[in-house]
Structure formats: structure tokens, C-alpha cells
Amino acid sequence: MLRDLFVKKKKYAAIPSEQVRKDVPDGVMTKCPECKKIMYTKELLKNLKVCVNCGYHHPMNAWERLDSILDEGSFREYDKEMVSLNPLEFPGYEEKLESDRKKTELNEAVVTGEGTIDDMLVVVAVMDSRFRMGSMGSVVGEKIARAVEKAYDLQVPFIIFTASGGARMQEGILSLMQMAKTSVALKKHSNAGGLFISVMTHPTTGGVSASFASLGDYNLAEPGALIGFAGRRVIEQTVREKLPEDFQTAEFLLDHGQLDAVVHRDDMRESLRKILEVHQGGEMAVWQS
């Protein structure tokens, strides 16, 4: 028809979205969930996985975290071979554990060991939210308790980086008792004059936030980290009030006295170094008395 002659034709051919995706290999680019900026993954990794545009702190795995804070080549891992069983015979639990082991190349949701920060020996534990959302089961609690006891034996500070959804439901009461076990180990370490630094990263919730994560001599957190016990919706339904938009963020907790500092990832190693340096003389005096 004549009117078809006057229809404005597209100047460019439409390229199917699938074809566009195929042009960029997986893993080359990363999209920031906060500002939506797309950047080279290599650039993000170089910046300690902090968005170069908005400063959003992307999750780090355990090994990336250890590399960012410890002296190169100084880390020695503890209890690497410990693995979770299925004591309550929870359906499908063993398959999920095996799937996470293959996906993360970890045996559990926490890596523990010793290393140095500016040549100062520390015992460190780093939780990895890729493994069962960093949930705390029997092995996670046992590894953390053993790490604290090792710090006690070596008379050195203990540092933990938390990232967890809370207690592991598939292990029931056995997971909940880890809250008490880890807290008792930390109390023994504290009574002997040992330093404990807790660094809460996104997210730190449930039984982890209600136990060892909040017991530090210094409680630090990364910017924007979600930290809390119960979920926002549960709390609002309980108190029947609308909560502030920034409720349960690291900044909110700092303003209300639950944290000592919110530390940017770029500054974390130096902040830890300064704390360790300040306590070096005093702590050794306590141990030796």
C-alpha cells in the first residue's frame, strides 16, 4: 500500500540480546547491584571488589579477604580437612553440602589459620557466604572455637571477619549450641588479656550476630553491611512500627553505639595494623604477668 512507502524505516538492525551477551565472555564484566554501572571485572578486583563509581562493597570470598589483610605468604591454615556430616539426617542436606564444596572449593563456611599483619602474628577466621550462606553449623563453630583456643595458646590477637545468615537450620540445636561454645572460648581468651577484633561484613545476621560477632574488644564493619538478628519484616510486624530506611545498616549501628567504627575496605589492613600496634606492648605485659 502507498502508506507503507512513507513509514519511517529503522536505520539500524536490531541485534538480539542473546547475541550481545555472547560477544562478551562470562566473567569479563561485572554490574554493580547498587549503581548499575558495568565495569571490567579485572578493574573491580584490583580495587578490592569495591565499585569504582559508587563505593559499593561487593562480597569477598575467604581467600580474597585473607590476601587483602595478611602479609603475602604468611597464612597457615588450620583444620582444613574438617567437614560437616548430617547428624539429624536432614533430607537433602548432604547433597547441598557436596554441591557447595564443589562450587566454592571449600570444605566449610569458614577458613581459619594464622598469619601476620606487618609482621605481627594473629589468628584469623574468615567466613565465606558462598557456602550455605555462611551459616553456622557444628563444624563452623568448632573451627572458630579451636582458632580462638589457638590464639589463647599462642598469646596473640584473634580477628574474625563475619558474613553469615545465622545458625544452620539443618543441624537444629547442634548449630545453636555453637553460639555458646564460641562465646565461652572468647571469654577465656579475654580473661587472659587476649585481644579480639570482630569485623562484620555484609550480611552478618541471626545467631552469628547474636554471639561471637558482637563480642569484640573492637567491633568494626564495612560500609553498608547488613547487621542484625531478626529480619526487618519480622521486627516491623512485632513492634507494629515502620523502621527507618537505614535500619540494621553498619552506619545505623555506629550511630547507635553498637559499632566502634565503619571502615572502608581500602583502609581495613591499615586500621587493623594500628589497633594491633597499640595493643602490642600492653597485651604482652598482661600475658606475662
UniProtKB/Swiss-Prot annotation:
The GO cellular component terms are: acetyl-CoA carboxylase complex
| GO terms, biological process | malonyl-CoA biosynthetic process; mycolic acid biosynthetic process
Its UniProt entry gives the catalysed reaction(s) as: N(6)-carboxybiotinyl-L-lysyl-[protein] + acetyl-CoA = N(6)-biotinyl-L-lysyl-[protein] + malonyl-CoA
Cited function: Component of the acetyl coenzyme A carboxylase (ACC) complex. Biotin carboxylase (BC) catalyzes the carboxylation of biotin on its carrier protein (BCCP) and then the CO(2) group is transferred by the transcarboxylase to acetyl-CoA to form malonyl-CoA.
For the protein in the UniProt heading, the enzyme class is transferase
Per its UniProt record, what HAMAP family does this chain match?
Answer: AcetylCoA_CT_beta (MF_01395)
| Pfam families, per the entry | Carboxyl_trans, Zn_ribbon_ACC
Q: Where are the zinc fingers (C4-type)?
A: 32-54
Q: Which organism is it from?
A: Bacillus cereus (strain ATCC 14579 / DSM 31 / CCUG 7414 / JCM 2152 / NBRC 15305 / NCIMB 9373 / NCTC 2599 / NRRL B-3711)
Mind telling me which residue stretches traverse the membrane in this protein?
A: none
Provide the residue positions that the database annotates as binding Zn(2+).
32, 35, 51, 54
> Its pathway?
Lipid metabolism; malonyl-CoA biosynthesis; malonyl-CoA from acetyl-CoA: step 1/1
Every CoA carboxyltransferase N-terminal domain range: 28-289
Quote the SUPFAM superfamilies the UniProt record gives.
Answer: ClpP/crotonase
Its gene name is accD
Q: Which cysteines are joined by disulfide bonds?
A: none
Q: Which positions are tagged coiled coil?
A: none
How is its cofactor bound, per UniProt?
Binds 1 zinc ion per subunit.
Family stated for the protein in its record: Belongs to the AccD/PCCB family.
State the protein's name. Acetyl-coenzyme A carboxylase carboxyl transferase subunit beta
Question: Which is one GO molecular function term here?
Answer: acetyl-CoA carboxylase activity
- State whether it acts alone or in a complex, and with which partners, per the record: Acetyl-CoA carboxylase is a heterohexamer composed of biotin carboxyl carrier protein (AccB), biotin carboxylase (AccC) and two subunits each of ACCase subunit alpha (AccA) and ACCase subunit beta (AccD).
Kindly list the places in or outside the cell where this protein is found, as annotated in its UniProt entry.
Answer: Cytoplasm
The record's keywords, sorted A to Z, are: ATP-binding, Cytoplasm, Fatty acid biosynthesis, Fatty acid metabolism, Lipid biosynthesis, Lipid metabolism, Metal-binding, Nucleotide-binding, Transferase, Zinc, Zinc-finger
What superkingdom heads the lineage? Bacteria
The Enzyme Commission number assigned here is 2.1.3.15
